[in-house]
């Protein structure tokens, strides 16, 4: 940087101290709020909805994954390349939680034994599907829908207007909060909760 150059506040804070180190002494609630505010700022910097959430979480939470994994979020913006499917912010939240609580390999074992262990890991109590099922259910409870086209229907003819951008910024902030809460809460407790919509009648 040239002498005397000025940085935007959000860029200055990131260069003064490594982000994870800077937030290492925060309480869980402070980290959740920091993640939400970073996601919010990301939108004004030019990140799309999915990128905003994944970048904010993965910049604070040390997953051991390379920073390049953030690139995986790009195509999900606007409900997958503006297709209007699942909201990009919601997908970003799922990706962020997966980066921490997802599976990198199957359980040890062979044949039917391995398959049964895998099924239990997903469907059991605790089970990963119980944890991830909370993300879309919480998002829908907050916003009424999970599909981009339904959330943004009133702006289909004025997609790039300010009101639409402000609306999506709130979705992004909320989705980042959902992801952060699930990551920073007790995993087994979160993964033992009842299923929500779609499989709410699945036997315990």
Regions found by a protein language model. Give the residues of each.
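Active-site-adjacent bridging/hinge elements
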Residues: 27, 66-69, 150-152
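Amphipathic alpha-helical interface segments
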Residues: 50, 55-60, 94-97, 110-203
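Short, Lys/Arg-enriched N-terminal segments with co-localized hydrophobic residues
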Residues: 10-25
